[in-house]
């Protein structure tokens, strides 16, 4: 109550988090939210097209997200080995499924600061590991 009367916070605020949020909000405003949504859709469309061509989609397309694509491992690859190889060679990670889906699916994120070129690059690296 006393700190509120002095227009102060009751505890020390997390300044790095405040600065990070400010930085990201500034970037979003500069790019424009319509452009952000368009970029995420383009990346999602790209990832889903790649997945359908090489594997399959885990969810029905009507439930597809423009932030993450879950790929159904229809080829029976060892997902963990591909993830490890891409991470070691390119310092980039993508994730496999959880629990029962660990080797049955893998996930490709396409949101935030990622660009369409980076999504295409990751998909190319995965393709290279599949040969």
Task: Outline where the language-model segments fall.
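A common structural junction motif
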Residues: 86-94, 127-131
């Amino acid at each position: 109550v006393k700190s509120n009367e002095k227009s102060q916070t009751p505890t020390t605020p997390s300044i790095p988090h405040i600065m990070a949020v400010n930085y990201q909000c500034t970037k979003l405003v500069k790019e424009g939210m319509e452009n952000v949504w368009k970029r995420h859709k383009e990346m999602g469309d790209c990832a889903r097209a790649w997945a359908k061509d090489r594997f399959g989609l885990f969810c029905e397309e009507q439930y597809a997200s423009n932030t993450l694509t879950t790929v159904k491992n229809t080829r029976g690859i060892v997902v963990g080995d591909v993830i490890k190889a891409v991470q070691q060679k390119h310092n980039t990670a993508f994730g496999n499924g959880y629990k029962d889906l660990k080797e049955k699916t893998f996930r490709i994120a396409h949101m935030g600061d990622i660009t369409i070129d980076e999504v295409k690059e990751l998909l190319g690296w995965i393709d290279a590991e599949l040969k």
